[in-house]
Amino acid sequence: ADLIERRQRSEFQFSAVGLGPRTDYEVDILTTFTKLNYEAYTYPR
């Protein structure tokens, strides 16, 4: 959970300085990538 929170904070910081995704296409990629990472981290091994 701590890792997810850190990632979300850094994403907010990137967006604040204008380095975040600027198009819907990039947002979709980032959302999918983040969801896949989240599922990989939380998937029971």
Swiss-Prot record:
Annotated keywords: Chloroplast, Plastid, Thylakoid
Organism of derivation: Pisum sativum
UniProt-recorded name of the protein: Unknown protein from spots 23/28/205 of 2D-PAGE of thylakoid
Misc. remarks from the entry: On the 2D-gel the determined pI of this protein is: 5.3-6.3, its MW is: 27.1-28.5 kDa.
GO cellular component: chloroplast thylakoid
Compartments, record wording: Plastid, Chloroplast thylakoid
